[in-house]
Amino acid sequence: MSLVRLAHELPIEAPRTAWLDSIIKGDCVSALERLPDHSVDVIFADPPYNLQLGGDLHRPDQSMVSAVDDHWDQFESFQAYDAFTRAWLLACRRVLKPNGTIWVIGSYHNIFRVGTQLQDLGFWLLNDIVWRKTNPMPNFRGRRFQNAHETLIWASRDQKGKGYTFNYEAMKAANDDVQMRSDWLFPICTGSERLKDENGDKVHPTQKPEALLARIMMASSKPGDVILDPFFGSGTTGAVAKRLGRHFVGIEREQPYIDAATARINAVEPLGKAELTVMTGKRAEPRVAFTSVMEAGLLRPGTVLCDERRRFAAIVRADGTLTANGEAGSIHRIGARVQGFDACNGWTFWHFEENGVLKPIDALRKIIREQMAAAGA
């Protein structure tokens, strides 16, 4: 299936159906002009690193190292690179949703310059992630430390972007119930995952491992979100997005990379809905006021609540407070007071009786949340 759209053939701020799940061929800045404002949820950018290589690099056996010496990684000066970086970041910021986030990966050659531009343009830095490579290239000349990592910057669109997605509980669960740290250990792309041409040569010199992109998407997006990659290359972002039930839009100007990415993405089988469910914590759930339970008719004023052992009791009042022992307050405050504690989760402490069985009032809160979800709230 053809995924390719020509940038110059797309209208300015083209409708979603014209660019979703496609590769736009063209320069990244001009192609981004075709996308509407606030149209993407997450951006992953792997821009040219501006490696400033001064010549060929050889191994001790005099074989030449395959390095990035392509024309797209060459700039006249740092000033030219900075101007390029500012242009594509500005274009990305326009299409990023107010609650969206951007990931930029780079090496020591460029990541600090990119970070400065991000802050100057109003992005708000959330984390820097160190990708530690299990199998990095040696330093053949022995004049520097072995360069064994790359750096990712994760940023929200601005300081006010409070509603961005971070699947904290899922990341923690995937890390043996320990908080996910900001240093990630992955091998560089090798073996069957590395795309090769008919001569057995690498299709792209800086192909990123799918595991890296999968972690980024699982951490900062939801199924159905739109992931933009303005430097699409061999299509790792598109392949992972399709497999994980996300939409993608890639921008690439080099036809050989577009051809390889198209074939790669067409071969991907998406995961099923059950496999894509993201584990969420209570912080991700919508807030429910106790009065909402009463307004829905699930509890009535005058209802007597108690703890699961029936040691303490409180009466529900019409204003949504509880009263016990001459005091009135929230479900949390009264739960704490009757126990002599400083704090209490009233939703799990207080129970109501239904058909002779005690149930936590949290069960009623879940009903309200289900109703909110059905209403799209």
From Swiss-Prot:
Keywords: DNA replication, DNA-binding, Methyltransferase, S-adenosyl-L-methionine, Transferase
GO molecular function: DNA binding; N-methyltransferase activity; site-specific DNA-methyltransferase (adenine-specific) activity
Top class in the EC scheme: transferase
Family of this protein: Belongs to the N(4)/N(6)-methyltransferase family.
Organism: Brucella canis (strain ATCC 23365 / NCTC 10854 / RM-666)
Gene Ontology terms: cellular component: cytoplasm
Pfam families noted in UniProt: N6_N4_Mtase (PF01555), RAMA (PF18755)
Segment forming the signal sequence: none
Catalytic activity: a 2'-deoxyadenosine in DNA + S-adenosyl-L-methionine = an N(6)-methyl-2'-deoxyadenosine in DNA + S-adenosyl-L-homocysteine + H(+)
Gene3D superfamilies the record matches: Vaccinia Virus protein VP39
Residue ranges of domain RAMA in the record: 271-373
PROSITE patterns: N6_MTASE (PS00092)
Record function comment: CcrM-mediated methylation has important cellular functions. Contributes to the accurate cell-cycle control of DNA replication and cellular morphology.
EC number: 2.1.1.72
Record-given protein name: DNA methyltransferase CcrM
Highest taxon of the lineage: Bacteria
Biological processes, Gene Ontology terms: DNA replication; methylation
SUPFAM superfamilies attached to this UniProt entry: S-adenosyl-L-methionine-dependent methyltransferases (SSF53335)
